[in-house]
């Protein structure tokens, strides 16, 4: 029996938007099983200078509930490659806005661990008003700053 083709993608997935769904659907079309690596809160703080709005465990639960996703795992606090090495995917999907990984450098680092996955970058952004979590945050602040929220 042939082994299932496994794809991996990674990200923060804070304040979900159509771009996230586009990347996840794209990834699932390339594999039988899609595993999503969720960036840890501390990692996001180091990279972006702020913690995510949604805590890592809640982001993991939300991503796992999405149709194209078979499983979600939290990233490593010490080594960003650790979950990829443990999963040993056939394909790695890089989102259009991801700049953490340079593809050639990622290939070289994975080859040092004996891994040779195909790496595909999603080139197309979703053309919509809120295609990034940051844009959503800016709009929330714009609408609600200095206003009392009514619940």
Swiss-Prot record:
Disulfide bonds: none
Domain of life, source organism: Archaea
UniProt feature coiled coil, ranges: none
Cofactor requirement: a divalent metal cation
InterPro entries: Archaeal_FAD_synthase, Cyt_trans-like, FAD_synth_RibL, Rossmann-like_a/b/a_fold
Family per similarity comment: Belongs to the archaeal FAD synthase family.
Functional description taken from the UniProt entry: Catalyzes the transfer of the AMP portion of ATP to flavin mononucleotide (FMN) to produce flavin adenine dinucleotide (FAD) coenzyme.
Matching NCBIfam families: cyt_tran_rel
Subunit structure comment from the entry: Homodimer.
Protein name: FAD synthase
Gene source species: Methanococcus vannielii (strain ATCC 35089 / DSM 1224 / JCM 13029 / OCM 148 / SB)
Lineage: Archaea, Methanobacteriati, Methanobacteriota, Methanomada group, Methanococci
Gene assigned in the entry: ribL
